[in-house]
Amino acid sequence: DRAMDALRHANQGGVAPYGGMVIAVGDDPTGKSSTLAYQSDQNFHSLGIPYFFPKNVSEIIPMGLEAFALSRYSGCCVGLKIVVDTADSNAVVDMSRLRPNFPKMKPNKLVHVTKHDPAGARESKLHEIRLPEVQKWCAKSENAVQIYLPVKKGKTRLGIIGVGKIANEINEALITLLPDGGKSNTVAFTALNMPWPLPEQRLSDMLSVAKEVLVIEEKRSFVEDQIAKICVKKDRNMLLSGKTNPDGENLLPSYGELSLENICLLYTSPSPRDTEV
């Protein structure tokens, strides 16, 4: 929070084409190592900083490398949200197998830092030039969205979007609770590793085919709100659940940390509507 002003100036100022700035932010959803429990999603949005949310230790390096590439391409600072459980864990990573795996795109020369732009020009450049370039990148990024169970037209009834780390628990729950891990079921499951700006094009199949979409994210709703906005604009006739079900009944807490138990309880408490798993 205390760094917000400096980060806002850096992001609206822009970065150099051979520079790049990645901001690693440590989130402590339970206050394990902090005086307060908190989330950084709304801060990134307020600053206009796109960000990745690695699910585990192994994803930090590839997403970090892509974050630098995206920063150079778009002129934006790019965030890397790392929650305390990921920061406190360890993993063996084979560095020899790490290869850059991100879009190869020619940058717009107008996105990069210039000298002495007035405040209004810096703000408009961020929103009219840089962030649209980020959206173009997201549409082609393999790290931004990972599909575990694909959408099947005419069959998929429930689409699940897991945001960041919680996708690990969702995948475990599906393997445990559903036959064949849900592969032959009516469920589609996507892990979202870039909560903002939302890679809308990568989610279009799910949002147009599924009868109901369930967004599972920790803390206050953030991705769910973005998807609701898309559905209103596109006039999508589907049910949307997340912190509450379509009838307004509570499903997931807006505080603390989600667990495998939370996900399994969702399976035993289905939507009161006609969506079947």
Residue locations for each model-derived region?
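Short acidic, glycine/serine/threonine-rich loops at helix termini
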Residues: 2-6, 31-38, 63-66, 72, ...
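Glycine-rich, anion-gripping cofactor-binding loops and their flanking helix/strand elements
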Residues: 146-162, 167-233
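Conserved small/polar residues in nucleotide/adenosyl-binding loops
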Residues: 267-274
